[in-house]
Regions:
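Conserved alpha-helix/loop element of class I SAM-dependent methyltransferases that forms part
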Residues: 11, 45-55, 63-83
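Alpha-helix N-capping/helix-start residues
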Residues: 21-22, 67, 113
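N-terminal auxiliary segments of SAM/dcSAM-dependent transferases
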Residues: 1-45
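Conserved nucleotide-cofactor-binding alpha/beta core module
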Residues: 74, 78-154
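Alpha-helix boundary/capping detector
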Residues: 36, 40, 53-55, 99-100
């Protein structure tokens, strides 16, 4: 059932949104979204809907982007293994994991400590190691040190 939902997400949501790069589609296949969501939302992991980020029963007032939007972002930034990325706004860590598959490193900036630790735990559980974490509003030292900048939160 989960594999069918993952397949449908890729074929019926992501591809129709003009995401066609094989390596991006493979990244979504190899990094299932459900593993990044709170248990209460895993049943909705592959639906084309924004989900609230609830951590330990507490609403963080953060909304997670849909898979098709995440795929569009990953394809658009077109990261290379020699490039570094900065991501402002962390969410559940799923976008970070996808970006990290393509980048030399990703530095994430998050204001909410519980979101940062939740995402960090998710990324560690999925063996994503090329991520640096900053508990701050982000980019206090400018953007020149990064090849790509992704604004994923506001």
């Amino acid at each position: 059932m989960k594999r069918d939902a993952l397949f449908n997400m890729i074929e019926q949501q992501i591809r129709p949104w003009d995401v066609s790069q094989p390596d991006v589609l493979r990244a979504f296949h190899d990094m299932p979204r459900a593993g990044f969501l709170p248990a209460s939302h895993r049943a909705f992991a592959y639906m084309d809907t924004e989900l609230p980020l609830v951590i330990d029963g507490v609403d963080t007032h953060t909304t997670l982007l849909t898979p098709r939007v995440l795929a569009r972002i990953v394809q658009a930034v077109d990261l290379k293994k020699t490039e570094t990325a900065a991501q402002v706004g962390l969410g559940d860590g799923y976008l970070t994991a996808l970006l990290a598959k393509f980048a030399k490193s990703v530095t994430v900036f998050e204001l909410n400590e519980s979101i940062l630790y939740f995402a960090q735990r998710n990324l560690n559980q999925h063996a994503v190691r090329n991520v640096n974490y900053e508990l701050s509003w982000g980019l206090k030292n400018g953007v020149d040190q990064y090849d790509v900048l992704v604004l994923a939160g506001s």
